Amino acid sequence: MDVLLIGSGGREHAIAWKLKQSKQLGKLYIAPGNAGTAQCGENVEIKDSDTPALVDFAKQKRVGLVIVGPEEPRAKGVVDAMEAAQIKAFGPNAGAAQLEAD
């Protein structure tokens, strides 16, 4: 299964490192990623705040799962947008994420 991991921090590096160990992982894309995540998968130059571009990328690459790490994109509805586009996403919806973001 191909996965899109959204974020660029240490949390995302740890998630990417662990995902890379899975035999079920196909291609791992990280947007925007960092130097550490580049060792685990392919960094993609899309800001984690650019929801339309992230949805378009996930559709284009036909990823099977999107994992949203940072609080800000979650609070701005990235998970909701992915689900509306029929893309499986891991993370809280915008309403639930507001509890952490505020």
Sequence positions of predicted segments:
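ATP-binding N-terminal substructure of ATP-dependent carboxylate-amine bond-forming enzymes
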Residues: 1-95, 99-100
